[in-house]
Amino acid sequence: MDLNDLLLQQQEVTNLLSNLQEAHKRILISNEDENNDLNKIRKDILICLNDLKTVNSLIIDPRDGLIKKNLHKLEKYEQELRSLESEEAAIESNLNQWKIDQDPENVRRKENWGTVPINLVGNHQYLLESYVNEVGIENTTLANTNGNHEETPNSSKFTREQLLRNARKLKLCQEQVNSEIDQLKSLISQYERDRNVINDEYNRTTELIQKEVNTLSREEDKINSQREKILKKLGLLKDHEQNQPRNFFFSLGALARVDNSDFKIALSQAYEFIDAKKQALKKILHENKSQTMSLEHNFSIWNDVIRSIQGLETNLQQSFIEKEGNVPKTDITSMISRTLSRVNSIVGTYSKDSIFTSILCELKALQKALDELNGKMQPIPIKSSAKTPELLQMGKSPPKVALSKEYASNLHESTEDFPLKINKTD
């Protein structure tokens, strides 16, 4: 049985007991003949006391009590969350190690790269500079800013030999620059091939890295999935698979229930919630442990009291049968006095808990009957009690509230605000 259901049932039995005691008091002080109802109420009170005793035992049992089980669950959830937290930290550390440094300068500094000179066979610039220096830049197309290739005014200064020599030098320079361009084109083609290889290898390598990252991310998702299950068990996240929401008997008002979308908020509250719930459970355990002796005592005393009173009723009934209703007043007063003394001795100095109020009502009723008898001359006929209807006894586990069928129907007025339920045993 769930602890919250048991705590709710404990409260229901407590409320029922209070209603029964009110009805018990009302019948004892009334002048109406409700002897049958009185006997049923006495037994129902005894059953409620036994139910409370049984519920108390189920709550505080040191071996398999529900408080111990729930505390064990909370400690287990806390350990699992901390273990998952450690696993997540390890995964985050691994993920950080798989990050690619996006700044090439950092890699260059780590690798301590140098420069690679590009050597070309030939030097057309030397020949070109030699030619320009020989003819003068003003006599070349470099000085023609309009792009007009017509003969310049100073071209007539060159002799035939100079023009032929310049032509040979320019021809050589032309051949050289073409050769160097071909070398550069070949180098560029090689660089492009290298670039393609680099790109292919980079993509392949990053795919391998991404696979490792994805594997770690899936592990992280599994951790969050396990966390989500724990948070749902704790009640910090709503479980959409459940059709009906769970109602808790005791609530921790300081911690607001979160929505299913607020996973991070719920996770941040988990340890605080577990600690608060553990404290609440320990408080309930302490309260119920402090009531154990009282519940045992209440049941024992009330059981002895109603046995004494039922013994009085049986003796009076037997006397009336044997003496055909003509029982001397002295015999009646003697039996009542003995019962009164016996009940007083059972109670002793005990005056704790609400059950003492019901015992006190029985004592007052006995004393009132004794006073009335002492004030009258003729014997007072006392009607025999009808056979008490059977009560639906509470099973051992789970506990069920025991009620007589007749009482459930006769006590509508006093239990109007408290629906009585008869639970069948499984």
Swiss-Prot record:
GO BP, sorted A to Z: autophagy; protein transport
Membrane topology: Peripheral membrane protein
Keywords: Autophagy, Coiled coil, Cytoplasm, Membrane, Protein transport, Transport
GO cellular component: cytoplasm; membrane
Coiled coil stretches, renumbered: 64-101, 165-230
Subcellular location: Cytoplasm; Membrane
Family affiliation: Belongs to the ATG23 family.
Reported function: Required for cytoplasm to vacuole transport (Cvt) vesicle formation and efficient autophagy. Plays a role in ATG protein retrieval from the pre-autophagosomal structure (PAS) and is especially required for autophagy-dependent cycling of ATG9. Also plays a role in regulation of filamentous growth.
Protein name: Autophagy-related protein 23
Native species: Kluyveromyces lactis (strain ATCC 8585 / CBS 2359 / DSM 70799 / NBRC 1267 / NRRL Y-1140 / WM37)
Name of the encoding gene: ATG23
